[in-house]
């Protein structure tokens, strides 16, 4: 499954490479994105994913993001991310930026009559070819019906190391790119620190407003733990529009 995802993603990247070389997405701006995907794991089997998100920058140094996911496996997620940014300059030269991120997720597993909440606080650094962050996370899961809240069907994980490392083939402001990432928290899930998620991404700017992107990810373990998401492997494609 993971080999197929990687192969398809690389093929789509090769198709996009001839497009323009300079990015039109250099500045923080309001944008909307949507994508659809296919996912599979041993718990929910084959299912489709539908994601939407909105980037809501207040200014060049502070931005927020709202995201939502629904799947045909009757799982639902709402995410909120806020991120102050602090540019670093040395001798009037741009040396990247430091980011302070707060990320909150609400997950609803309708089929299992469970829901969960996860939150993470991290410090990150982003420059031309790298985006890295590390922080502290916590999560809990419980039955939806209050009368069923017992020690047996509610779990609280107060301590978790959150990490994210993404390496880009070209400067991240380029008009097309491909990247490889390892993390334990994405837009729609937070895993335990020893359950890494491997992600391969690409994007291409087709106009000043429109960006197309592709993503494939796999998680070799983690289906049985309380923080596990809805898939062991997933591939998706979508578009974003910048205002």
Where are these regions (language model features)?
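Short glycine/proline- and aromatic-enriched beta-strand/turn motifs that initiate or cap beta-hairpins
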Residues: 21-72, 242
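Transmembrane beta-barrel strands of outer-membrane/channel proteins
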Residues: 34-40, 66-70, 82, 100-106, ...
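Repeated loop/turn-to-beta-strand initiation elements of outer-membrane beta-barrel proteins
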Residues: 59-66, 88-100, 128-134, 140-142, ...
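Residues on the lipid-exposed face of transmembrane beta-strands in outer-membrane beta-barrel proteins
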Residues: 36-38, 52-56, 80-86, 119-127, ...
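Cleavable N-terminal export/targeting peptides
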Residues: 1-31, 243
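Predominantly the C-terminal beta-signal and adjacent terminal strand-loop region
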Residues: 180-184, 189-243
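Residues that define the transmembrane beta-barrel architecture of outer-membrane proteins
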Residues: 30, 44-50, 74-80, 96-98, ...
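Detector for outer-membrane/organellar transmembrane beta-barrel domains
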Residues: 116-188
């Amino acid at each position: 499954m993971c080999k197929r995802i990687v192969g398809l993603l690389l093929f789509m990247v090769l198709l996009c490479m001839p497009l323009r070389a300079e990015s039109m997405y250099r500045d923080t701006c309001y944008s909307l994105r949507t994508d659809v995907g296919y996912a599979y794991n041993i718990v929910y089997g084959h299912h489709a994913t539908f994601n939407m998100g909105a980037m809501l920058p207040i200014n060049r140094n502070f931005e927020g993001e709202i995201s939502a996911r629904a799947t045909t496996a009757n799982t639902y997620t709402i995410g909120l991310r806020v991120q102050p940014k602090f540019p670093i300059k040395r001798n009037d030269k741009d040396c990247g930026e430091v980011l302070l991120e707060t990320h909150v997720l609400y997950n609803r597993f309708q089929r299992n009559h469970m829901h969960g909440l996860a939150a993470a606080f991290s410090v990150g650094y982003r420059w031309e070819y790298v985006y890295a962050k590390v922080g502290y996370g916590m999560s809990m899961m419980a039955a939806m019906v209050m009368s069923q809240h017992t020690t047996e069907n509610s779990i609280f994980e107060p301590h978790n190391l959150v990490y994210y490392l993404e390496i880009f083939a070209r400067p991240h402001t380029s008009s097309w790119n491909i990247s490889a990432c390892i993390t334990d928290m994405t837009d729609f899930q937070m895993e335990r620190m020893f359950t890494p998620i491997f992600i391969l991404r690409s994007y291409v700017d087709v106009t000043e407003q429109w960006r197309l992107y592709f993503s494939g990810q796999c998680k070799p373990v983690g289906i049985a733990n309380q923080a596990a998401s809805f898939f062991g492997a997933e591939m998706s494609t979508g578009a974003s529009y910048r205002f």
